[in-house]
Amino acid sequence: MERYYAAIDLKSFYASVECIERGLDPMDTNLVVADSSRTEKTICLAVSPSLKAYGISGRARLFEVVEQVKRTNYGRRMRLANKEFSGESIFSSELDKDASLAISYLAAPPRMALYTKYSTDIYQIYLKYVAPEDMHVYSIDEVFIDLTGYLKTYEMTPEELVQRMVSDVLKQTGITATAGIGTNLYLAKIAMDVMAKRMQPDENGFRLASLDELSYRQELWGHTPLTDFWRIGRGTAKKLEANGMRRLGDVARRSLTQAGEDQLYQLFGINAELLIDHAWGWEPCTIADIKAYRPMNNSLSAGQVLKEPYDTEKTRVVVQEMGEMLALDLTGKELVCDQLTLTIGYDVKNLQERQLKTAYRGEVTTDAYGRKIPKHSHGSVNLDQHTASSRLIIEAVLGLFDRIINPDLLVRRITIGANHVILEKDMRPAQVDLFAETEMLKTEQERLKKEKSIQKAMLEMKNKYGKNAVLKGIHFEKGATGRERNGQIGGHKA
């Protein structure tokens, strides 16, 4: 039996929510979701469709929005006889009718808790039509659904069923979507990401496209750029292009011979298998496989991008805060770990300011924007036992920090991770050192037990009264970010 999957992506989700909360039409309102209290370099979490129409990408930085609107307004003004605007508007319908109006837009600060609530409500709407075991939540605004078992029940085609679900979401929330249907998960994703987004929307802004293996090869084997395809980043695309493969059809053709397949494995290792499958439009993984998957190794990690470059002293404060937060996260989930990792990313200013640049003699790399930066510092440290003790974790991560940090450089990014994470109840008893003092071991175990009780009490208070209900002195030191981040979800305002 042929299977049918749907991928549904809520249209400019955060921006749509902000429009709806203001009683505005998401398809007609120029709005950007960005924290303007930060610098203009802050990334926009969402841009409304009407604002995107002026050439602004969905993940632009705020200054890019400002500059593009300014450029577009200059062009509009130059076309006016008197070279002066009569007013301004945030509505595309008004701007289309009246060329004398300047383009304006709303900048809405992120409200992550609100977006999470909308996402949960929309998930409940989907559950009216399909069971949870046939749905995989890919992100806050995107889901995959196995439609196969429901087509006969509803006496509908895959397209009709998806249309009904999206119409229900629109009716109840005001948010529209883009959707793709495919005979496997990959084709559903590509139908949505590539095919649907180049189609004309209906009167509600809804786009829908379908693909099977044959139509995928006919429609998309010649498509460029390669980065439009799921899981093909700039690095992979560059490597393919350097070897004469500028389209997925080229990859499929190369894989037909043993020599070509061997070359792909030499270039990409085990990832070549997935690349070849996707070039042909194959994807064996199902939603049932995703639900059944259990990783061999578990880890927890947290990272943050600092608002400004930090020196070593202030960075150490943040690392200590992050170590404590990681320990509390483990405690709350009844987990323990026995290894920590730390990555310190340095700021671009280190190679721009003459004094810093001349002092640096280390390895240089490039960031996502092609700018030269010092190579990051990375290290790991093993703990003597599985633990969630904030004392042991902070001691270990600060020792690791002191070992790997380049004190002459300014820091911009910090990532901390806990590896070999297991459930606390699955811990093996610690190996007893025959030469250790029995009394010392007993004292340490009692100390760890007390620490665990304190950490649990802190979590209970934070859960009841808010994350800033219990704070330590470190949270008030210069450079500390913990208090502010406690009011955020995913690094953005809750």
Which role fits each region the language model picked out?
Residues 11-13, 37-41, 346-351, 421-424:
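Short, charged/polar surface micro-motifs in flexible loops or helix N-caps
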Residues 17, 370-494:
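Acidic, metal-coordinating catalytic segment for phosphate/diphosphate chemistry
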Residues 176-178, 341, 413-415:
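Residues at or immediately flanking beta-strands
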Residues 1-287, 439-494:
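Gly/Gly-Pro- and Ser/Thr-rich, intrinsically disordered tail segments characteristic of DNA damage-repair
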Residues 7, 228, 238-411, 426, ...:
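DNA-contacting surface of Y-family translesion DNA polymerases
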